[in-house]
Amino acid sequence: MVSVVTDGTTKRPTVTFTPALKYKHYAGVETYTDGTTTDTLEMRGEVGLLTRNVKFQGDSTSEANQYGAHIMLHSGGDESLEGRFEYIELMHVGQAFNLGRYPLHFHMIGRVTKSYIRGCSIYHTFNRATTLHGVHYLTIENNVAYDAMGHTIFIEDAAETKNRIIGNLVISTKASNSLLNTDQTPACFWITHPDNIFRNNHCAGSPRYGFWFDM
C-alpha cells in the first residue's frame, strides 16, 4: 500500500510504503564547489508507472519463446495513415530473431504528422520498444520502457527526420544477440540523424549506453 500525505504549510508530499521498501533508495541533491563555481547534481531516482487500463500483450508462451505480440503500421505514402497510441500497456511484445517485429513499429510511411505514441508503457520486450523506419514528424512522448532487449527507442535508417522524442523514460535495457551486432552493447536511445528533436528524456540501467549517436 502507498499513502501520500501533503503538509498544509510547505505543500510538500510525504510518501509512505506499507510494507517498507526492501532496499534503500537515496533521493537528494548534491552540491559541489571548486571555490569559484557551484554545481548541483540531482540524485533522485526515476519512477515510471507500468500499469494502464488497456493492455496489449503476448500469450502465455511468449516469455519462454521470446515471441510476443507486435504492432506494425505500414502504408504507402505521406499521411496515408494515422496511428494514435495513448496510455496503453504493452507487455511481452516483440519477437527475437525476427526483423521488423518490434512492439510498436512505424514502417516506411513518410510524413505522419497526426500520429503519436504518448503515455504508453512498453516492458518485458524481446525486440526493442519503439522503432521508427522511414517516417517523419512522429511524436513519441511521455512513455515508459522497461526491460527491453536491444536498442530501446530506435531510429532505424538515418533517413528519418523531424520526429519528436520528448519526456520518455527508459530503464533496464538489455543486451540482445538476436538483432544487430551493436545490440550486444545496447543503448536506451539509438539516434541516427541529427534532424530529430530529443528533449527531456531519461534513461538508467543500460549495460552500456544511454544515448548512442550513430552518425
Residue spans for each PLM region:
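Beta-strand/loop edge motif enriched in small/polar residues
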Residues: V2-M215
